[in-house]
């Protein structure tokens, strides 16, 4: 029994190592299991440093049985935002806001511009409290802190564009109508 157990443990470890799904230093995510930076890959388990700086020891079978997202190997980072504008925003304002956001992204050196990389600034839906514009674009950087900086700059630019067009962001609200009884 011991030989079979050791053999299966080695098989799982070898699968983790041979498939090269990740290596020491990689930022990985396994849904419902772990997210963090790989510190070591051992015989039976892998040690991952979580983003709260705690260490987690994960049995290797978890990596063999689950999808592993290796964020270190990403080529770009995606921004996928829903921008909610008030219902009083006119069609003309919506067109201008969408165009100016798209123009900003196309002119900025921070974003990927290629035929095979999606850039979309489109009205997505008429939500309960807003007209929603979905923005999807990809940054050139894959580094987390740089990505946060690009998002911050983009958010401020979008706010400027919305204000310049004399529109406002929506917030969840409820309208109450009271009927008069005659």
Predicted features by range, described:
Residues 1-12:
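Single conserved hydrophobic/aromatic residue that forms the stacking wall/gate
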Residues 7, 25, 38:
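Conserved hydrophobic/aromatic pocket- or pore-lining residues that grip, position, or stack substrates
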Residues 30-32, 37, 41-182:
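Structured, soluble regulatory/oligomerization domains located on the cytosolic or IMS-facing side
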